[in-house]
């Protein structure tokens, strides 16, 4: 399942790779795989995150209503279609502002059921959220509470495709399908993800508005005091804020759009306090 947000494109490539492999080896398919590549087609066509003209986030109207407005009617149809499935994977990219390491996100009230699946997904990181912070109008929340185990993956950045991230998740999906008996092939070797809870994540934000210039080439392991980047003031030729890691750990979210305003997210760092 992907395409809920029209500016999240990694899922398009993931669906392409899955269909390509299914078509290449139909004899290996031992179950039913339903693929929803674009549940917000108007958003994808116009490159907008929400549903055009309605200014509405598609991932805020589930489980929908058969007698409701257009978006609610579509959401209800999607839910009805998926009910009874053994598993659903909701694939997202980040927005246009930050880049995300391939990760699986699950609620703490569903982690006992979902964590074994999440570990098979070939993600680098599994982030376990407090259920209090999760909106009950999302697809994943609705399906989990209706009895369909649902994982949420996040990767890359909005309006872009990162093929390496996509291929990693595709390998994870086929690994998961092999373990579930849906795909008749040897399970793939996958990453052993870092498991984090919300309390182990530090949010680094901009103290003032300016231009962010990254000092790290990529996300991954860092040490305490590592120079992550600077927020600069071009007119005065000065550094407004030097941003360093407060802990040993990994950066799994990093600013992509250089223009920042006070309070904007620069990075998320997992590690000890």
Name the predicted role of every residue range.
Residues 1-273:
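Structured catalytic-domain cores with a bias toward divalent-metal coordination
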């Amino acid at each position: 399942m992907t395409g809920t947000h029209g500016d999240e494109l990694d899922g398009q490539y993931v669906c392409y790779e899955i269909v390509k492999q299914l078509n290449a080896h139909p004899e290996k398919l031992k179950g039913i795989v339903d693929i929803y590549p674009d549940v917000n087609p108007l958003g994808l066509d116009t490159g907008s995150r929400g549903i055009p003209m309605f200014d509405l986030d598609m991932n805020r109207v589930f489980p929908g209503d058969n007698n409701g407005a257009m978006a609610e009617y579509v959401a209800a149809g999607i839910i009805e279609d998926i009910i009874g499935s053994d598993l659903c994977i909701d694939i997202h990219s980040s927005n246009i502002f930050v880049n995300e390491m391939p990760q699986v996100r699950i609620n703490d009230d569903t982690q006992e059921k979902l964590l074994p699946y999440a570990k098979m997904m070939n993600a680098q990181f599994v982030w376990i959220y407090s259920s209090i912070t999760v909106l009950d109008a999302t697809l994943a929340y609705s399906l989990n509470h209706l009895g369909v185990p649902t994982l949420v993956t996040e990767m890359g950045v909005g309006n872009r495709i990162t093929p390496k991230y996509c291929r990693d998740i595709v390998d994870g999906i086929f690994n998961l399908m092999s373990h579930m008996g849906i795909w008749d092939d040897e399970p793939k070797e996958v990453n052993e993800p870092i498991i984090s809870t919300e309390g182990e994540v530090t949010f680094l934000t901009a103290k003032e508005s300016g231009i962010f210039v990254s000092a790290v080439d990529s996300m991954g392991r860092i040490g305490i005091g590592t120079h992550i980047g600077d927020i600069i003031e071009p007119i005065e030729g000065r550094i407004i804020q030097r941003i360093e890691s407060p802990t040993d750990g990994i950066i799994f979210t990093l600013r992509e759009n250089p223009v920042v305003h006070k309070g904007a997210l620069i990075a998320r760092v997992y590690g000890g306090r």
